[in-house]
């Protein structure tokens, strides 16, 4: 898959 979500720590977009 390839879901992009923001990390609760920095808010960076991670795939």
From Swiss-Prot:
Keywords: Calmodulin-binding, Isomerase, Repeat, Rotamase. One of its GO terms (molecular function) is peptidyl-prolyl cis-trans isomerase activity. It catalyses: [protein]-peptidylproline (omega=180) = [protein]-peptidylproline (omega=0). Its EC number is 5.2.1.8. On the 2D-gel the determined pI of this protein is: 5.3, its MW is: 72 kDa. This PPIase probably binds calmodulin. PPIases accelerate the folding of proteins during protein synthesis. This is 70 kDa peptidyl-prolyl isomerase. It comes from Pinus pinaster (Maritime pine).
């Amino acid at each position: 898959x390839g879901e992009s979500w923001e990390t609760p720590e920095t808010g960076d977009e991670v795939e």
